[in-house]
Amino acid sequence: MMFSKPVVLATTALATFAAATPLVARTEPTCSSTEIKCCENVGTAAVVSSVLTPILVSIPLVGPLLSLLGLNAVVALLFGTVDVVLGLTCSGIDVGGSCNAQTVCCENVQFNGLINVGCVAIDIL
């Protein structure tokens, strides 16, 4: 019983803080120039499957899972959803450089840069 008051106080404080924190909709991706990628293939797993499948097969332990479970199950397992937008065959863009494919900003990079996850198409001037 001695710990009940601190626990109630901490829980109340956290709930108050969470309720007071405003939610802000993201309309533009926040991406620094070092995170901008030029990707030849951008889309969901279904859209980029012909490029994604050989990449996944080449990754140890993922290849056998792909054979057992199929592409959608492996993508959901690795990235949380089959609807995540992936960037494949990507390279960085130097300041002042150009991109002859799709310019994207991606939330994170997986498998040493082979797969860029959570990508949003952007326009650069």
UniProtKB/Swiss-Prot annotation:
Residues 1-20 form the signal peptide. Disulfide bonds join C31-C105, C38-C99, C39-C90, C106-C119. One of its GO terms (cellular component) is extracellular region. It is found in: Secreted; Secreted, Cell wall. It comes from the Eukaryota. InterPro entries: Hydrophobin. It holds the Pfam family Hydrophobin. GO terms for molecular function: structural constituent of cell wall. Keywords: Cell wall, Disulfide bond, Secreted, Signal. SMART domains: HYDRO. The keyword Membrane does not apply. Its main location: secreted. Belongs to the fungal hydrophobin family. Aerial growth, conidiation, and dispersal of filamentous fungi in the environment rely upon a capability of their secreting small amphipathic proteins called hydrophobins (HPBs) with low sequence identity. Class I can self-assemble into an outermost layer of rodlet bundles on aerial cell surfaces, conferring cellular hydrophobicity that supports fungal growth, development and dispersal; whereas Class II form highly ordered films at water-air interfaces through intermolecular interactions but contribute nothing to the rodlet structure. Self-assembles to form functional amyloid fibrils called rodlets. Self-assembly into fibrillar rodlets occurs spontaneously at hydrophobic:hydrophilic interfaces and the rodlets further associate laterally to form amphipathic monolayers. This is Unclassified hydrophobin 8. It comes from Pleurotus ostreatus (strain PC15) (Oyster mushroom). The lineage of its organism: Eukaryota, Fungi, Dikarya, Basidiomycota, Agaricomycotina.
